């Protein structure tokens, strides 16, 4: 008798069957695909067990070629062989030509905002070219795993803007992939090393690939990675190391002037071999034939190689220093340094990075594969392959989160449909002179005014140093973890005083309530925007009135005549009346009139302040 299979209601007969998901590193120079098998993340190779797929696509009259063969075609047919297409995603034709003026490609001029490349017998755009690379990786994965994929996590540089991210997503969908998520490359590298569950703190990701260098400074807090700063050089990478060795070889051989394409390619190949061999050897010798088939032999030592690349390496460290400065951090505040990209295998690079940050970089995972491996771990989580106890619930925010600003306005910090976990920060300032506290009112919703949104929490930041209005810098950070728990922290930057609160944004809301809130925001969009513009002008009128009245009280009697004071007071009375009415144009005119009436007063105050500051000082002491 056949046995019946019994399943939980709503589930398949095999509810715990693993789903196949992959992580894809769509790189500028090389691309990879990885998956999690038997609990271990691994990259997948082709039929020749080659894991790195050169990100090169060649178009002929008969076919489209991707990978190693296309890379070989690059020197033979450069106009029809697209290299480093990732640089073109989401960019206009003007952007591309400004950044890369010497490209050998024939671009169609008809639509500069959506660049098209004329290749053999057809026109293609960067999304289509990228999709060829992604299709090759998808087919490799399906052949290796024996089934269709449930989805993929595709990585992008942390600095990619919305257009570049959308281009990447479109390319993946065109390649037949269900995109589970776009993941920042430095975050993927950190996940590969398990840093997402490690001690909280600052992580630097140093990514030196074949053609580009990127440095990313991340902060890990409550399981969420926040990108604090990014930097780098889109025209510096391991290829430049190869060119420095070629230059050295040419000097050894006394070769000046142009080289034949064949000899140039041979020298580049030998330079790459020498670079890689010097990671394990003190000296390397290469043999090759010149154009006259004369056999030549050249040697290069590790010491010489290090001298050749010293300036290039220093350039990457300068970018690291700038990124730390942008993040307002010191080197000793960095907890871990993750190395990404094949060029970080060079011992000299690792030594210099270690010396710069004052700690040994993480290098145990193949730097070529670390991003794809991290992406595959994330993909495995997103398709639900983790046991219940380890299940990470990842979703999107159903409604925007923000806070109240002056005038009862809502400033959105994290917009709806943002994937969680997520962290975002914005800076705010004080409205009044000498203000020492700020009430933080956290709101949820899509409307422009506080009264039309849902109040989540209120807390007060005390201890703000007394300053002039607008001088204090309060950084408010919103963090939503994988369980949808919101943590809001406010910190005054000069003193370091801070306060925070936690709240569950979705608590008490069902789908129908969320839907109603979204409908209301769409139905009232025009009216809400007009109300916001009016409130903003009213707040500005109140700010100008308060600042000008305070200045008059402080210095008016000393610096102005009675007539001048009367003129300013009259403009303030007009401003006060206008600010209480609903005519936006009248408020704007009243603000402009008050500014004009107080112009001479502002100049006198400035002169008075300078004289006061210089009193009792000699030129030499200043």
From Swiss-Prot:
One of its GO terms (biological process) is iron-sulfur cluster assembly. It comes from the Bacteria. The keyword Cell inner membrane does not apply. Pfam families: HSP70. SUPFAM superfamilies: Actin-like ATPase domain, Heat shock protein 70kD (HSP70), C-terminal subdomain, Heat shock protein 70kD (HSP70), peptide-binding domain. Keywords: ATP-binding, Chaperone, Nucleotide-binding. GO terms for molecular function: ATP binding; ATP hydrolysis activity; ATP-dependent protein folding chaperone; unfolded protein binding. HAMAP family: HscA. Belongs to the heat shock protein 70 family. Chaperone involved in the maturation of iron-sulfur cluster-containing proteins. Has a low intrinsic ATPase activity which is markedly stimulated by HscB. This is Chaperone protein HscA homolog.
